[in-house]
Amino acid sequence: MLRARKGLWVLLSVLLAFWIERAISFPVRHHKRSRNGVYVENQVQNHLADSHPHQRRWLQHHSTGVLPLPEPEEESKPFVLDFKNLPDLANADIGSQNPNIQVTIEVLDDPPMDVEMDLVKEWSNDWSTSSPSSTVEWLGGKKLFWPLFWGYTDADSGEDGTGQAEDEEDDYDYDSGEPIPSGLGKTDGDWTHNRYEEKEEEWSTWSPCSVTCGHGNQTRSRSCGDFCTSTESQSCDLVPCPDDWNSVGHVFPFEMENGTEPYGTDVGSCEKWLNCKSEFLQRYLQQVFTELPNCPCSYPSHVSNNIVSLLDVGHERSFQWRDASGPKERLDIYKPSARSCLRSGLSKNGTTLAAQHCCYDDNKQLITRGKGAGTPNLISTEFSPELHFKVDVLPWILCKGDWSRFHAVRPPNNGLHCMENPQQDIFMNELEEAREY
């Protein structure tokens, strides 16, 4: 009996110890009654909270009911190295077993570095959305993307991005002392390009004619930047040289009346020119007289140094005209009684290279006859001043200035039926002088 009681107490002790242990390990709820009889439930306290601080912080963070958004993962794209885009590697033989190519690729996984220049901070808006991890310090990582900056000058080595020495000075001035690669946007530094700041210089005056007689050239120039000079050239026609008075070697391919004898250099060259029966010339002259505009009856005052468009009633359309009274026209020799002249421009729809030539007196009235009248130009100076001289001026010289004989082949234009000018008595005097000359 005693043994049974003792065994029972041992069993009860074990059960009591087990129950106490379970009671201690089970979470305890504390209740507090309010005055209105409503029970308020406190938060459950876990005895493991003190031993795991990170779990407690997690509970406190999520107690607000707001879950943090997961950080977006950047899409990783494969890096493609295209040798065709790299000048120094374009001709490399990558098919051989050991190609002579050395490529350095640097990967930065560290946190963003402090940039020592304001270059990255002031990039344009296109770069503002990029993540901080994509920012590369220019001073520390200038060789990371070296193919993009071939012109970058290394102050220490004196070489550019390709490893070759820089021979020419950079045209850019930058107050930070470091050259800036192109295409990186605006910076705080005050940098300008010398070439675009310079104002375009004025043209110099025309140089004297390269010859003292006959046909020559004159030039003018202006600066277009460092080590650059722009030059323009134009022809200048002076008094024909003595050797040119009878020279007809390069005139239109005219044929003589008998079709066999070419132009000579004898005294009868004018007669040979007058008696030319070239079929080509006849067709060309007919086309010229048909297409060219009629001479205006008065000289337009606003045409000086300008190109004007004037309506031609006979052709029912407008033609462009320009002044032809400059010094190189030598009106004092070829049109002695004219004060000013006009020359029509080449037409886009025209089938010839000719131009109408009209001259005017002191009263700006068209000279329709006599020594000052203009005649059609078979070759416009707008197309070729050299050919114009040989085709339109040289025949006048061959006839020794006898305009009456010249006008028999190239009659002055008066298609608008302007008043005859000069008057009859003056015209007869000029005609007598020309024949006696």
Curated annotation (Swiss-Prot):
It comes from the Eukaryota. Residues 165-176 have a biased composition (Acidic residues). It is found in: Secreted. The lineage of its organism: Eukaryota, Metazoa, Chordata, Craniata, Vertebrata. Glycans are attached at N217, N258, N349. The keyword Signal applies. Belongs to the isthmin family. GO terms for cellular component: extracellular region. Disulfide bonds join C209-C236, C213-C241, C224-C228. It holds the Pfam family AMOP. Its main location: secreted. It comes from Danio rerio. The gene is ism2. Residues 1-25 form the signal peptide. This is Isthmin-2. SUPFAM superfamilies: TSP-1 type 1 repeat.
